[in-house]
Amino acid sequence: KDALPFTVIPEFIHNGTLIVDDIEDNSDLRRGKPVLHKLFGVDIAVNAGNAIYFLPYVAIRDSKLPAEAKSKAYDIISSQMLKCHLGQAIDIYWHSGQAERIPTEEEYLQMCANKSGSLACIAAKLGAHIGGGTESQIEALGNFGETVGVVFQIQDDILNISENQSI
């Protein structure tokens, strides 16, 4: 029950990244419906996506966590969000046609770990931290979350180039 206010944090972050990603990809639809920037304009969508990134900090600030636990939660979110945006930047660079070569498998997997692995890592690490896990448990669950995110990103990339959307 005490952890309930924190369960929305990964969803806030994920939805913010989806808004921004839709703009960067110039998508028309998300989950079968028009994307935010097509409905309200890029300026409103960028502002909304960015604003959503800060909602987790408000949830933590307003929580009953001790100051040290709040600081650790802020660090988990900040460090992983930086990785997320680095991964997205690399993905944009590769898709822009500016890259001089095809990325290696290792480079691709690192991009996946940064871009999507970091989001799942936030959920796993934050849950372990708020649940009272040890540092080794927090790291182990973070690594597990990152791996889940990598697998998700690989599947998403396959779906983006596949005609068979049921893969």
Residue ranges, per PLM feature:
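Mg2+-dependent prenyl diphosphate-binding active-site environment of isoprenoid biosynthetic enzymes
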Residues: 1-167
